[in-house]
Amino acid sequence: EAAAAPLPNHAAPRGKAGLEGFDGLAEALGGTVLGQPDYLQKLVIALKRPYVMGREGESARNAFLVTGPADTGKHLSLCAAAEELARRGVFVSGDISWMDLSLYPTAAEEKLFLQDLYMALAAKGDIVVFEHYERCQPAFLTVLSNLVQRGKSPLAGRYVLQNGRLVDAGNALVTDAVGALTPRGKYLVLL
């Protein structure tokens, strides 16, 4: 069986701070995201959960859905939370990987989707946000569902890593074929 894509060196260790890094976080975010105290408290709970409950291996640290009307601070709150948690030493980086799933409406975009997903999961930040899931090819949503529910999503073909990118191996015999993707300990957020 082919292995899951290996972790880049920067993705293995996460920030050093633990639960104490979340103290007063909702209040701090309230200075940036105005008028949303209940939402910010729920966001902090979602981000804090894996530090309370724990997690195994490369499974997602947590997966959650952020909903609400346009222009209510969803993007801003995620960015502010990531930056503040990085500043506090909980996250290694304040970066967020964003994937617009409306770019993959048909099965013809499979290779592009897998490449973009791999790059998002391999990025330095701790959060991957998936936007416009309702406009995505349903088969690709199954990949995301597997990442959330099983902690791994098998790939239909075999891939190899070349210069940090997943490349279809076709029928080539390769020693380090990638047969699955893992969440790599990231937060997976549907927006």
Residue ranges of model-derived segments:
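Extended, charged/polar low-complexity intrinsically disordered regions
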Residues: 1-20
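Pre-Walker A (pre-P-loop) alpha-helix and adjacent loop at the N terminus of AAA/AAA+ ATPase modules
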Residues: 19-62
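Walker A/P-loop
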Residues: 55-98, 145
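Short loop/turn elements that form and flank the Walker-type P-loop nucleotide-binding site
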Residues: 58-61, 72, 91-92, 122-124, ...
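AAA+/SF3 P-loop NTPase mechanochemical coupling elements
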Residues: 60, 156-191
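Conserved AAA+/SF3 P-loop NTPase catalytic/coupling segment centered on the Walker-B
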Residues: 77-78, 110, 122-165, 187-190
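Short glycine-rich substrate-engagement loop in P-loop NTPases that contacts/grips substrate
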Residues: 93-126
